[in-house]
Amino acid sequence: MARRVSTTRLLLLLLLVAAAAAAAAAGDQEDPRGGGDNGTARLDRRTKMFLHAARASDGGATGMEKAGLGLFDAFFASLSMILVSEIGDETFIIAALMAMRHPKSTVLSGALSALVVMTILSTGLGRIVPNLISRKHTNSAATVLYAFFGLRLLYIAWRSDSKASQKKEIEEVEEKLEAGQGKSTFRRIFSRFCTPIFLESFVLTFLAEWGDRSQIATIALATHKNAVGVAVGATLGHTICTSFAVVGGSMLASKISQGTVATIGGLLFLGFSLSSYFYPPL
């Protein structure tokens, strides 16, 4: 009897052990599946984060490409505008005539300093205007200005006598230079800081450029194009034109047909007007 009881207890104990082992085995099999689900979820989250980062980087790259295109577009527009509007202009002739009587390096440095200051002021004014007036209105104003200057230049090219007008303009500039010879008070005040020749070149160039069509066109360009591109392009254009004027002197100015320059400039300004009208900034 005692042996039967002990045998029964032993069987019950074995059954309990077997049940516990089976439960443990089942738990071990469920854990990997749960871990796999968690791992898959973590992998999905990482994949989404990677895709989001990749899209963001692609968007940033696209934005940089657009900014680069805007910079080069403004640069070439400003450069071409200055080249066709400044060759043979009053500032061009001033630099050419002064270089015939004074050291070329001094005349060039004074004229370029004035033109750089004028370009920075014009570009800054062009960036301030859109903050005061809506971008749509500034673009419309720029379109009208481009068309006005283009038609005006074409009218000048059609009506003017190239040789007579060029000779008259040179005589007017010579009169201004001769009139400025007697005014030495301004020179004496600043003689400690700048040489009289540098100062004369700077002041004459600055006053001749103020209100000129190239300054107004620079302001108009800066209202709807990249300001850095406009400033760099205009500065490079002024540097090229003024360098030609200083090196070539009046000989180069007298051989360039003002009618041809006015025609090219008029067509270019009309092209700017059409581009601004049909492709306005966003």
UniProtKB/Swiss-Prot annotation:
Pfam families: GDT1 (PF01169)
GO BP term (any one): Golgi calcium ion transport
InterPro entries associated with the record: GDT1-like
Annotated localization: Membrane
Lineage of producing organism: Eukaryota, Viridiplantae, Streptophyta, Embryophyta, Tracheophyta
Protein's UniProt name: GDT1-like protein 4
Signal sequence range: 1-26
Organism field: Oryza sativa subsp. japonica
Presence of keyword Transmembrane: yes
Membrane-spanning segments: 67-87, 106-126, 138-158, 189-209, 227-247, 259-279
